[in-house]
Every structure is written in structure tokens, then in C-alpha cells.
């Protein structure tokens, strides 16, 4: 049922539904830092966890690593560094008491290249080194949707890559919110009235492999991984998790699942 109806949830609602399902099955949520595994005879037997300033060893029969943007760090702790990159992406929430972004609108996407600054604005900004790459023709992809008493604007036209982010929450550049807002002007010109309004900006990392296929499958005996879902994590997570669970339990898996196995980076063929 959860898989069939996953599209009816937002990201937070989906997370809460999964947490409630875990608790209903007797699972519990424990906070800590994953430090690696302890091995006996070459096999991983327990996870090393730091909790409340103490390091603990948690024995397991099967360990699944699904740490989202923490995946590069978790793989390094395991001694399995794989060729991953992390792209910081940001979203901006703008208050919209006048309803300039229609409340009944679906997710809107502008799928054409665009220039987000007028010629007179570009003349004023061309000496700003950080803004210079944004002054020309930018790729498509600006999107937004209503949320609460405002709307979310998302546009990362020139994403950068980080090989080893130190955390899960990148710091947004000061202009991230305005860039996202300007990206929606072709769709909703009335949003120009919100220039100068201070948005709430946050973000995270899109972790990806070189060919932009996820990691799903065994890393070593007893250790499995699910991650590098790029920018489609919420959409793909439940189907991917279902496939990984079936595989780990020795059940039949979809033919496509094995194409995502992390061993592809170790197989010369």
C-alpha cells in the first residue's frame, strides 16, 4: 500500500509515514554517528557508532547504508571510496500574501533557456565575480510550487560539484533566493513584485555517480548500500528500497536492479 500511494505524500509526510510504519513493526530510531564496521575473518560483524560521546559496537546480521548526502563519508569510513560527487542545491520559500503564485497551481517548470537579468542590470553586475556566470544565457529548469502561505522557488542553473562534502547542509550563496525567484518570471511575471522580499533559503546535496545511476546492492558480505539517487530520491526511494530488501533477503528482484550494483565500479568489464 505504501508503494502504491507514495505519490500522495510530500517529502516530510512520506518520511513520517515511513517512521510510523517502522515503529509499528517494533523498530526504533537511534541517533548517532556511523564510524565504520568491525570485521572478523574478513566479514563485517558489527557497526561502530558514536552516541552521546561514547563509541559503541552494534552487532548485525545485515547492514543497509542509506545515508543520503552522507553516503560519500560513510563509504570512506567503510574503506569503499566510490567515484561520487555531491552537488549543492537550494530552494527558497517566499511569503506570498497576495497570491501571486496561484494556490491551486501544480508544480510549474520553465523548460526553456533564459536570461534572468535585464541588460541594464547586467551592466551593473558584470564586475561581481560571483554573479558573472549568471549574466548570460542560462539552462532551463526553474521550477516552483505553492506551499503554505507562500511558494517554493528552485533554480540551480550552474550547479557545482564537491567530491567530499564535510556535512549534509551546504551554505547557500547570498543570491540563491533571488536567482530562484527570477527564474520563475517567464512563467509568472507578477512575481517581479517580490524582488527585495527576503526568502527562507535552505538546501542539501544531490549525490550522484558518474553515469547518474544509483547505488543499490551489496558492498561486501553482510553490507548493502542504497544511495546516490541524485535529484530523484523521494520519487525513487521506495521502489529502490523494495528492490534492495528483496535482493538482500534472497527473493526475486527486478532485472534492472543488478545494473545499479556498486560492484560495477570494480568490474573492468
Where is each model-derived feature located?
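Helical element adjacent to the flavin cofactor pocket in flavoenzyme catalytic cores
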Residues: 1-61
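Internal, well-ordered alpha-helical segments in soluble enzyme and binding-protein domains
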Residues: 10, 14-18, 33, 43, ...
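C-terminal lid/capping helical subdomain adjacent to the catalytic/cofactor pocket in oxidative enzymes
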Residues: 219-269
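Central helical "cap/lid" subdomain
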Residues: 53-125, 173
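Mid-domain beta-loop-alpha active-site segment that forms a flexible
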Residues: 1-21, 68-70, 176-183, 229, ...
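Hydrophobic/aromatic beta-strand patches that form the interior of the parallel beta-sheet core
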Residues: 30, 64, 214, 224-226
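Active-site catalytic microenvironments for nucleophilic, acid-base chemistry
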Residues: 21-25, 70, 77, 243, ...
Amino acid at each position: 500500500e505504501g508503494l502504491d500511494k507514495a505519490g500522495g505524500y510530500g517529502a516530510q509526510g512520506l518520511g513520517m509515514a515511513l517512521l510510523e510504519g517502522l515503529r509499528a513493526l517494533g523498530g526504533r530510531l537511534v541517533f548517532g554517528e556511523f564510524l565504520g564496521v568491525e570485521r572478523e575473518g574478513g566479514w563485517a560483524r558489527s557497526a561502530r557508532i558514536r552516541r552521546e560521546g561514547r563509541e559503541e559496537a552494534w552487532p548485525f546480521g545485515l547492514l543497509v547504508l542509506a545515508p543520503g548526502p552522507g553516503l560519500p563519508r560513510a563509504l570512506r569510513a567503510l574503506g569503499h571510496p566510490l567515484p561520487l560527487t555531491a552537488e549543492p542545491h537550494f530552494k527558497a520559500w517566499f511569503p506570498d500574501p497576495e497570491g501571486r503564485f496561484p494556490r491551486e497551481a501544480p508544480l510549474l517548470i520553465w523548460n526553456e533557456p533564459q536570461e534572468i537579468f535585464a541588460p541594464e542590470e547586467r551592466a551593473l553586475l558584470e564586475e561581481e565575480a560571483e554573479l558573472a556566470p549568471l549574466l548570460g544565457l542560462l539552462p532551463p529548469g526553474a521550477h516552483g510550487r505553492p506551499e503554505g502561505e507562500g511558494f517554493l522557488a528552485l533554480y540551480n542553473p550552474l550547479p557545482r560539484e564537491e567530491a567530499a562534502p564535510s556535512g549534509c547542509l551546504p551554505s547557500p550563496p547570498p543570491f540563491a533566493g533571488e536567482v530562484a525567484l527570477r527564474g520563475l518570471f517567464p512563467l509568472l511575471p507578477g512575481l517581479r513584485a517580490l524582488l527585495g522580499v527576503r526568502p527562507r533559503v535552505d538546501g542539501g546535496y544531490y549525490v550522484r555517480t558518474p553515469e547518474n545511476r544509483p547505488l543499490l546492492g551489496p558492498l561486501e558480505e553482510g553490507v548493502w548500500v542504497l544511495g546516490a539517487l541524485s535529484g530523484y530520491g523521494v520519487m525513487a526511494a521506495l521502489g529502490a528500497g523494495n528492490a534492495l530488501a528483496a535482493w538482500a533477503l534472497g527473493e526475486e528482484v527486478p532485472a534492472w536492479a543488478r545494473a545499479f550494483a556498486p560492484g560495477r565500479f570494480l568490474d573492468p568489464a
